[in-house]
């Protein structure tokens, strides 16, 4: 089986039925100043059971493209948010 990329992020939006938007933070070193800088990116995640809420921290795994912008499936809810 091929390696599947796994991402962890914070749910920032419930975008329609069975879809959530998560914000993923990564830290990269600036090439000139050698300081770690936070970079952010949003991903659309498929949530089959509509189980996540805004503020949850989740884990998602890469899958085949489910729509034009959605290529991740919900794996687990790591920490429940406050909503």
From Swiss-Prot:
> One MF term from GO for this chain?
structural constituent of ribosome
Question: What is the residue range of the signal peptide feature?
Answer: none
The cellular component terms of Gene Ontology attached to this UniProt record, alphabetical and capped at eight, are: cytosolic small ribosomal subunit
The record's section on InterPro entries has: NA-bd_OB-fold, Ribosomal_uS17, Ribosomal_uS17_bact/chlr, Ribosomal_uS17_CS
One Pfam annotation reads Ribosomal_S17
Coiled coil feature spans = none
Listed under GO biological process in this entry are: translation
Record keyword Metal-binding present: no
The answer to whether UniProt assigns keyword rRNA-binding to this entry is yes
> What's in the keyword line of the UniProt record?
Ribonucleoprotein, Ribosomal protein, RNA-binding, rRNA-binding
Which family would the database say this protein is a member of? Belongs to the universal ribosomal protein uS17 family.
What quaternary arrangement does the UniProt entry report? Part of the 30S ribosomal subunit.
Role this protein plays: One of the primary rRNA binding proteins, it binds specifically to the 5'-end of 16S ribosomal RNA.
Q: Kindly provide the name given to this protein in its UniProt entry.
A: Small ribosomal subunit protein uS17
Organism encoding this protein: Campylobacter hominis (strain ATCC BAA-381 / DSM 21671 / CCUG 45161 / LMG 19568 / NCTC 13146 / CH001A)
Organism lineage = Bacteria, Pseudomonadati, Campylobacterota, Epsilonproteobacteria, Campylobacterales
